[in-house]
């Protein structure tokens, strides 16, 4: 698939998610009580639970989540630049942390939560706002009882 076709598909995916999602906010404990990670994400995608504010702040959102796998999509802007004129590494890290964290959360039963224990990224190419869209994929490698391991990657429509 060519980059232009991929970009068109990504934009359609994002439009579909944006058309269904709820208000920006944080779900109350009574709203998520009894929901597994996947049930919680489905409720977010259906607009029954609020969309977390971090995505609004940094201009990214989840576009697909299934057990053990999550895809986020975003558009870096000038507000995300560092002093060198490229996208700040924290933007990369936050989007990747969201993808791998949600991949882990998607396999958790009701009543269980997660937090990031360690995050390491390797940035192999600078990113600017000239990139139309970027995706972050997170995948669970090992779903341990106490500590899960996940990996992620960030890429554009050209791969």
Residue ranges of model-derived segments:
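Terminal targeting signals and extreme-terminal segments of soluble enzymes
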Residues: 1-159
